[in-house]
Amino acid sequence: MRVVFHIVDYRFCPACGGALGKRSLKAGDPDRLVCGSCGFVFYLDPKVAVGTIITDDQGRLVLVKRAIEPGYGKWVFPGGYVDRGEEITLAAVREAREEAGLDVRLDHLVNIYSYAGRAPVIIVYAATMLSGEMAVDDEGLEVREFDLDEIPWDDLAFRSTREALKDYIDGRQTAAV
């Protein structure tokens, strides 16, 4: 299977302002944006996102109903993009606080998710609720807890949400054996 890389229509070099053109740097590699004036290579890097699967002291999961697209009205665990220079684990804790109003302790890495042709790389952690009152910010319509048998599988926003929740549940069952 050949992966297709999409080059966004950037026209000018961020280093010198010269014109960018598409060029292959090495045989077999996809075309890159290269400045004709200074030679700067404009790499379209992936965007790093984090997610936090939060459980309370009774093992219920915290999910947020999205108030923004994509996935408006669908359920996700708290998450979002990592800011440049921010530690990934601190971003996961920050997103839990911002999107669900909760302070958490990260317990372990659930998995890392990426998909061909998509920019985000999603790093998902399992976490335990420590304190706070469940509350949504402007990106959420509702926040609530779900028992494992109540997860709204048909109303989850993203493939990564479904896969991470399944991986989390499978990991809990394996650990319990």
Residue positions per predicted region:
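NUDIX/MutT-family hydrolases
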Residues: V136-L165
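A short coil-to-beta-strand element that immediately follows conserved catalytic motifs
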Residues: K22-S24, D103-V110
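Cys/His-rich short segments
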Residues: R2-K47
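N-terminal strand-loop-strand
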Residues: D29-V76, V104, H108
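Conserved hydrophobic/aromatic beta-strand scaffold that supports enzyme active sites
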Residues: F12, R32, I53, L63, ...
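Active-site-adjacent beta-strand/loop module that shapes the phosphate/pyrophosphate-binding cleft
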Residues: Y113-M134, R144, A164, I169-R172
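Acidic/histidine-enriched, glycine/proline-rich intrinsically disordered or flexible terminal extensions
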Residues: R2-V4, A157-V177
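Conserved Nudix-box catalytic region and its N-terminal flanking loop in Nudix hydrolases
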Residues: R2-V3, D56-E98
